[in-house]
Amino acid sequence: MNEKQEAVLCSPLKGRVMPLDEVADEAFAQGVLGDGVAVCPTEGVLCAPADGRVGQLFESRHALTYLVDGGAELLLHIGLDTVALKGAPFTVKVREGQSCARGEGLVVFDIGAIRAAGYDVTTPMIVSNSEDYTLKVLARGEVDVGAPLLCLRRKEAKK
């Protein structure tokens, strides 16, 4: 975050941007886990959306938490219901606690294998502590990895 308490998160994937309410999973679509955006990937590499560090890596390798320098907490979830794949199409390139630069590869995954198993590859990027921020989607349609995707502005503390 800068002096204005604002941060830009970049697209962690190459693909098509989707509003969360269009995601075919009720928990994500209704914002139960937080606000954010989703990308339907065309390439199977999930990258760091900002400078920060890896929080928790899920045992099934389909999801991780990411702590953005400045305070935002993210959930990056590759595909919908892909926990059932038990990690098979996912290769994690980082470890818990590892510092990462924006654009650094976090997880490589096989889009074809996920789809062949009957799963949707739509990948939500959730701001878990979204109650602390005002979010603005910066991109529509097709995006490349590293393209500005989401602006976070820290809300004023209530007095």
What do the PLM-derived regions correspond to, one by one?
Residues 1-159:
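Contiguous, well-folded functional domains in the mature portion of proteins
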